Amino acid sequence: MTPTQTNTATMQQRWETVMMNNYGTPPIVLASGNGAVVTDVDSNTYLDLLGGIAVNVLGHRHPAVIEAVTHQITTLGHTSNLYATEPSITLAEELVALLGADTQTRVFFCNSGTEANELAFKLSRLTGRTKLVAAQAAFHGRTMGSLALTGQPAKQAAFEPLPGHVTHVPYGQVDALAAAVDNDTAAVFLEPIMGESGVIVPPEGYLAAARDITTRHGALLVIDEVQTGIGRTGAFFAHQHDSITPDVVTLAKGLGGGLPIGAFLATGPAAELLTLGLHGSTFGGNPVCTAAALAVLRVLATQGLVRRAEVLGDSMRIGIESLSHPLIDQVRGRGLLLGIVLTAPRAKDIEKAARDAGFLVNATAPEVIRLAPPLIITESQIDSFITALPGILDASIAELGKKA
């Protein structure tokens, strides 16, 4: 049954009057959230299985984040990059420790994932080389440098020519990567799991091979952990499953628990490339956002949410696949970043059917439904989705019949 949308319709009309049309008109208008549940302006409730696209790792209205933000905003809200604050220093120290590199590591804070990747692009130029390698169908952001790295021509076409000397190779194919990297390559950019393109997991050993290839040619290995980091896959950084140390790691999304923050970590010689005056951010390292991030890290550690993400993700995958529904081919991903791969390109219809049933999911590809719920989601909430899923899939089939 389609939820009531009386107030939603009014909000949608207001949206269409004043907002840019790059997103289209949102199907619902959310008003509040608590834990893994959100409520719209017509009082319909939804289990949030997308978490703001892997942002709300502690769910909505988490008391630790509220306390940290409230304390900081009533103490000191903003300083610019001209002055230091204790929360940003502490957060940098904690991220360095979590990365665990055995060489010097330095941190730069910004406001988003695309900004972190933009800096990685700029840093690569400081090597004296200009060639870059990234993956076909990858997503690294929408600002110009990050867009050049994004291996999706449909997103790039309107903005060409793009910066860069970027070569895109098939994701997961070691031979193709090895053939593209040479002694003129500045950096290789890779996601540990390709989230936007359908939660695609590379073959075992791929990231380790990428580390070997880049080391052999003196190129930087940049690992984009914007979607996979902050414990989502069952390790704090997804690349840690492969026991490698990148030269650069980019972060955002879940780091701030809902507040905008990005981070750039560089190790070894790469940590010394950025020198006085070469980059900056007015809002980067904002004390309120860094305080929120520290609260996120504390809760992840004290409540064991990183390990829990792996356990719950395995359980969720098994539960969905055991339904043996004709529309489900497989479930791929790791931890609580999962993609339900469909046997037909019905993802948009299923996203709508799920929303009508009270579940927020994302059609990240025509044949893939992405799940990235808060790491605090309960087993019973996961079970409620698995129980409802056959009906959701059947409803999407019925809707297709109406369109025919």
Swiss-Prot record:
CC cofactor note: Binds 1 pyridoxal phosphate per subunit.
Pathway(s) of this molecule: Amino-acid biosynthesis; L-arginine biosynthesis; N(2)-acetyl-L-ornithine from L-glutamate: step 4/4
Cofactor(s) of this protein: pyridoxal 5'-phosphate
Record-level Gene Ontology MF annotations: identical protein binding; N2-acetyl-L-ornithine:2-oxoglutarate 5-aminotransferase activity; pyridoxal phosphate binding
InterPro entries, A to Z: AcOrn/SuccOrn_fam, Aminotrans_3, Aminotrans_3_PPA_site, Class-III_PLP-dep_AT, PyrdxlP-dep_Trfase, PyrdxlP-dep_Trfase_major, PyrdxlP-dep_Trfase_small
UniProtKB keywords: Amino-acid biosynthesis, Aminotransferase, Arginine biosynthesis, Cytoplasm, Pyridoxal phosphate, Transferase
Modified residues (N6-(pyridoxal phosphate)lysine): 253
Catalytic activity annotation: N(2)-acetyl-L-ornithine + 2-oxoglutarate = N-acetyl-L-glutamate 5-semialdehyde + L-glutamate
Stretches that traverse the bilayer: none
Compartment list: Cytoplasm
GO cellular component: cytoplasm
Record-listed N(2)-acetyl-L-ornithine binding positions: 142, 281
GO BP annotations listed: L-arginine biosynthetic process
EC number: 2.6.1.11
Domain of life: Bacteria
Record-listed pyridoxal 5'-phosphate binding positions: 113-114, 139, 224-227, 282
Note in the entry: May also have succinyldiaminopimelate aminotransferase activity, thus carrying out the corresponding step in lysine biosynthesis.
Subunit structure: Homodimer.
Family the UniProt entry places it in: Belongs to the class-III pyridoxal-phosphate-dependent aminotransferase family. ArgD subfamily.
Protein name: Acetylornithine aminotransferase
Gene coding for it: argD
